[in-house]
Structure formats: structure tokens, C-alpha cells
């Protein structure tokens, strides 16, 4: 009786433009109700969608969450970087060392992502979208293990990672110290209630696990916004609602 991860949601200044960028990088079909809400339909290896909604303000600091893309060869890594740059990405410096093999880029709205070097054993078998990498404590990693019911696949030196039982991207947390948040997060998780549970029942379960309410109910068909133990917002959708 655990929640389902429906999507990783980006708050964007131009949702359609950002969605087209990520569709070009990740592949997949775009759907949605207009320019303010666009969905990148999940692929089989991913299991969750990527949603783009209107609402991003000025970027005040490094995001708490980013995508790690994998490579099968040096040529493949270069091709992913070149393709991303051609679609509107740019190189950025977030303190990575010259000897590190991954390439750090930002999408057209400044959201960081990494193109990981080939041979990375931790992400082996995870698919092209290898991980959703988060800045967060061990406590929050254990919270999300319980929230989603995904097995804990890494738990060392305060770093944690979970992965769906059927495989796909890992969700990782880098451990303490956790960077101070700079305003409301641009990326967040969107959940739907588990089987046999309604929205309020799911909210109550998540609160019992350590989440806190940051906004009240938004009506019959609206999402409930919560915060995980590190203060990162996420939302629980109403039953039968595919996105907020």
C-alpha cells in the first residue's frame, strides 16, 4: 500500500519550450492541455513521466534535484552532449573537478543535469535516464523508500538510493551536509495514492512517515502539497488525476 510516482515535475517559465528540449534529449511523446501544462509520456524503462507546468520564478541557486544521463561509450557521451547543446543546453561550472568524467550542463531554463561517463558501475543497467539525483539527507532517502515502497539499493556514508523493483532510474540522495534551499524548488515529485487508498488517506500515511503539509487541500480534484523531512515540496494528486 505505497504511493505511485507519477512524474517529476518542472516549474518552467516556458513549459512547452522546456518540454520540447527534454523530449529531444530523452525521446518520447509530448501530450498536454496547452502551453501551460505539457507532459513527456513515460517510456518503458523510466516508469514515470516528466511534467512541465507554468510557474517558475528567477533561479536563485542550484536545484535540489537533477537528471543523470548515462553513456555506453566515450563517443556516445560526446553525442549526448552535442545533441543537448544543439537543442539549447549550455556548459556550466558547479565546482566539478577536471579529472571527473561527467559533463555538467544546464537546460534552456538553467536546470542542471549531468551526462555521466561510460563505465559507471552504480548506474549500470538503469537506462539512458540513469538517476534522479537529489541533494538530501539519509533520513529523507529512508522516507522516500517507505513512501514509494522501492528497495534501498545503496546506504553508505549517509548516501542513499532507491530503485523501483522492476528497475529503471535510481533516485539518489547525497547525504549531509544538505545545501540550503534557495526559494521554492523548481523540480518536485508528483504521487498518486496507492491501491485501495484515497488522496486524504495517502496524505495521512505520508504525514505519519514524516512529511509535513505546506498547503491545504485545493478542492475535490486538486493536489495536496506536502514537504519531505528535508523540506522539499511534493504533491499527492487526487484519485484518477494524471497531473496537477
Predicted feature residues:
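Conserved, structured core segments of small domains
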Residues: 50-55, 60, 68, 72-75, ...
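Eukaryotic phosphotyrosine signaling hubs
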Residues: 5, 62-67, 129, 184-189
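Vicinal oxygen chelate
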Residues: 3, 7-10, 48-52, 81, ...
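Intrinsically disordered, low-complexity segments enriched in Gly and acidic/Ser/Thr residues
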Residues: 180, 186, 190, 196-201, ...
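Short, conserved charged micro-motifs
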Residues: 16-20, 74-80, 139-141, 196-202
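Short hydrophobic/aromatic beta-strand micro-patches
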Residues: 11, 68-72, 133-135, 190-194
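Hydrophobic, helix-prone linear segments
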Residues: 1-47, 51-63
Amino acid at each position: 500500500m505505497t504511493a505511485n510516482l507519477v512524474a517529476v515535475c518542472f516549474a518552467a517559465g516556458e513549459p512547452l519550450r522546456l518540454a520540447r528540449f527534454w523530449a529531444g534529449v530523452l525521446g518520447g511523446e509530448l501530450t498536454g492541455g496547452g502551453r501551460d501544462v505539457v507532459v513527456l509520456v513515460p517510456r518503458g524503462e523510466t516508469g514515470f513521466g516528466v511534467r512541465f507546468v507554468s510557474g517558475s520564478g528567477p533561479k536563485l541557486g542550484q536545484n535540489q534535484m537533477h537528471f543523470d544521463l548515462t553513456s555506453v561509450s566515450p563517443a556516445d557521451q560526446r553525442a549526448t552532449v552535442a545533441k543537448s547543446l544543439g537543442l539549447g543546453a549550455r556548459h556550466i561550472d558547479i565546482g566539478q573537478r577536471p579529472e571527473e568524467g561527467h559533463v555538467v550542463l544546464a537546460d534552456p531554463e538553467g536546470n542542471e543535469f549531468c551526462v555521466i561517463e561510460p563505465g559507471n558501475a552504480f548506474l549500470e543497467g538503469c537506462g539512458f535516464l540513469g538517476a534522479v539525483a537529489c541533494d538530501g539527507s539519509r533520513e529523507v532517502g529512508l522516507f522516500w523508500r517507505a513512501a514509494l515502497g522501492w528497495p534501498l539499493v545503496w546506504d553508505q556514508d549517509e548516501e542513499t538510493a532507491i530503485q523501483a523493483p522492476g528497475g529503471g532510474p535510481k533516485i539518489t540522495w547525497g547525504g549531509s551536509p544538505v545545501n540550503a534551499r534557495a526559494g521554492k524548488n523548481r523540480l518536485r515529485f508528483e504521487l498518486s495514492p496507492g491501491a485501495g487508498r484515497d488522496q486524504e488517506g495517502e496524505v495521512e500515511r505520508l504525514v505519519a512517515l514524516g512529511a509535513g503539509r505546506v498547503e491545504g487541500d485545493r478542492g475535490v480534484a486538486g493536489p495536496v502539497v506536502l514537504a519531505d523531512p528535508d523540506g522539499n515540496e511534493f504533491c499527492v494528486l487526487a484519485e484518477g488525476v494524471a497531473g496537477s
